[in-house]
Design a protein with these regions (language model features):
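Glycine-centered small-residue hotspots that permit tight backbone geometry or close packing
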Residues: 128-129, 167, 229
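Large intracellular
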Residues: 3-4, 8, 18-152, 225
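Residue-level marker of positions within ordered structural domains that often coincide
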Residues: 42, 197, 230
Length: 230
């Protein structure tokens, strides 16, 4: 479990919520005022920012990109730890087996490793494919998997771009309604709330959810696996 990711979210949202709740007493002291939290909850703003961002992502990416979200969250919060030394020992072990018992003996040993990339590599060797061709095939597979990982992180980077944009759309909607109903004092504050809160939602969604997920996912794929295999 990656406690740093959990801690980052807790600290981030915690600081924001506490800052919203903090009020100042007449004597200059600070106190928590729960009623202040109501001003930051606005259903139309939520619909504009969250609904608009999801809709834009639906237009931009196929369904399989959304289906991968649980898998990506698992990688971020529960990353697998790999020991490079273990892979070196496995390769040396397979090399010794091939030298003593022949290449075909490696087929029975493949069950001892769970890494798909390593298994595929050994199978290519067992099939007596030329070394240059094996190297070419493996490099091509690595390039394909790396490109797929780039596309996976692009989903969240795009989300971090769309969220503030829809926050600005909500701000424009609120300002238009505000200017169109200046004589109606009952809706004046509501339209102003929509104008400001949507920007707030968009910035939070982009900089505390989408962009951190994209950066952490990229880091996990680069540094916590021996090969881009997921």
């Amino acid at each position: 479990m990656d406690f740093l990711s959990f801690l980052g979210l807790i600290v981030g949202f915690g600081c924001i919520i506490i800052s919203i709740l903090m009020g100042e007493t007449p004597d200059g002291a600070f106190e928590l005022v729960p009623a202040q939290l109501q001003g930051f909850f606005d259903l139309p703003s939520i619909m504009i920012v969250f609904g608009g961002t999801i809709a834009a992502l639906m237009v931009s990416f196929p369904l399989k990109a959304f289906a991968k979200i649980p898998k990506h969250l698992k990688i971020i919060f529960f990353p697998k730890k790999y020991n490079p030394q273990q892979y070196i020992e496995q390769i040396v072990y397979f090399a010794k087996e091939a030298r003593i018992n022949g290449l075909l003996a490696l087929e029975d040993k493949l069950s001892e490793t769970k890494d798909k990339f390593l298994k595929n590599s050994i199978l290519l060797v067992v099939d007596s494919i030329e070394p240059e061709k094996v190297r070419s095939l493996l490099n091509r597979e690595l390039e394909y998997l790396e490109e797929r990982h780039v596309q996976d992180t692009a989903f969240y980077y795009k989300g971090s771009e769309y969220a503030p944009a829809f926050g600005m759309i909500g701000t424009l909607i609120g300002l238009i309604n505000l200017l169109a109903n200046l004589e109606d004092t009952a809706t004046l504050t509501k339209n102003m709330a929509v104008a400001l809160v949507t920007t707030f939602y968009g910035v939070i969604l982009a900089n505390l959810i989408f962009k951190p997920i994209a950066n952490k996912l990229k880091a996990c794929l680069l540094y916590t696996s021996p090969s881009p295999r997921d």
